[in-house]
Amino acid sequence: MITAYDLFAQNGIKSVSMDDIARSMGISKRTIYEFYTDKEDLLCRGIVYTYNRFKKLLSTYESESETVIEAILGFYHELIKHPKCYNKKFYADLKRYPRAMEIESLYKSEFSETCRRLFDRGVKEGVFLSEINFELVTLIANKHINMLEPSKAFSSH
């Protein structure tokens, strides 16, 4: 599943066939179908796995960081280490898979709630102004993540 999700994230979902996945894993397509009903099932499970991993990571940064800025920068640093998570083609193809879109939406909503918690913490710490339009900042951050091409944006860092 991780191999399949990595291929989807790197090349776009539509571009990756079940044959490509089987070949990459060194197994037969039949073996894949013994565990997964179809490509969307693989995709959905990959999304769940990836978001749970990032959610756990963010939770760790949130609880172990002394300041909210430390938590945000630590997590953001982890995100940019994984450029495959930002392929524009992946997000464009995702629209063709309704169950996967639903899962993605749910996790984005959870992520927004976590961001809100971090923002509130930042206001309490005196790092953020309470007058900031949090919804706009969240919208910009989500769009930034979907449009980002770290290989180009961060090549000098």
Model region roles, listed by residue range:
Residues 109-144, 155-156:
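Hydrophobic alpha-helical bundle segments that form small-molecule/ligand-binding pockets
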Residues 10-13, 63, 129:
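Helix-turn-helix/winged-helix DNA-binding modules
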Residues 53, 82-86, 118, 122, ...:
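A short secondary-structure junction motif
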Residues 1-4, 21, 46-50, 54, ...:
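Generic hydrophobic, amphipathic alpha-helix propensity
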Residues 80-117, 136:
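Short secondary-structure transition hinges
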Residues 3-7, 78:
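Short amphipathic alpha-helical elements of helix-turn-helix/winged-helix folds
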Residues 7-41, 45:
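Helix-turn-helix
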Residues 45, 56-85, 138-141:
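Hydrophobic alpha-helical connector segments
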